[in-house]
Amino acid sequence: MSVRLVGLDFETTGQDPASCGVVQAAYVEWREAGAMAGAWDEEQAEAVVCNPGEPIPLGSTLVHGITDSAGADRARAALEREPTIITAEHHHFAAFAGQLLGEIERDDGILVSYNGAGFDLPILERHARRKLAGRHVDVYRLHKQSSAAATPCEHVKGGWPASLFKASLAAAHAFWTGELFDGAHDALVDVRATLRTFAAMLEHPTAGWTIEAALRATTEPLPGDVDFDGKLRWDHEGEAVWTVGKNAGILLRDLDAGFLRWVLNKDFHPDTKAIIRAAQRGQYPTRKTTPT
């Protein structure tokens, strides 16, 4: 059976995957084009505007151009163009999240996202009320792991803007394909850009990516991180250090016992919690060193 990639992207009311609402969902299916190496056929593509069931902050509207009737006038003034306005006729994402999850899993599909491991996938699973039973490639994590060692495309068409954030989808797309793209933060545009970026990674002469390697890398911590989400990082002496909030910069072994209990009661990644539980027992992670 040929490889089937399913790209997914959401535009939302905020940045917290545990609570934000979905205002646009896009899904694109690519299938390997027969015996042609590196060739893919787009078989399905759909983008749906969704009613998040909550007010849409102006700051979010400025990113994706979607608002509700209550915020329409402010959005017009801020955007200087007509926004997409959500009405009561638009369905809540939860109405079809389960169906979408099943469609991704069909025919052994591989979910492809950009920072989906930390954002889009938790949102989908929260609304579908179950976990993904299939495979997932997070192109963001691949880019972070390999862009420093790989050789970028020699010429980025249109020039490389100095303001381009190196971890953004736009930067990853430019790095691997040599092209900029218009319309970022439209979910359908972003999905296609993500798939193009992944396809270029697979064909890159020095990066060494295969689909199986990409699947493995999606489940591993990024370079320098102790845990999957990067809440803990290695310092120059090989000690684990907490990275966020008021305790940022404090060694794991020096964190207050009450703070460790707080982490375990909050919505942190299971990998992070496993390390914290070990720390409560006086067991701290040790950085592996490469023999010289």
Regions found by a protein language model. Give the residues of each.
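Conserved non-catalytic scaffold segment of RNase H-like nuclease domains
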Residues: M1-G134, P152-H185
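Acidic, divalent-metal-coordinating active-site segment for phosphoryl/phosphodiester hydrolysis
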Residues: D186-A199
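Hydrophobic/aromatic-lined pockets within catalytic cores
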Residues: A128-R129, S147-T151, T177, R196-T206
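Acidic two-metal-ion nuclease catalytic site recognized across multiple nuclease folds
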Residues: T197-T292
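Conserved beta-strand -> loop -> alpha-helix junction used to position metal-binding or nucleic-acid-contacting
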Residues: L132-A148
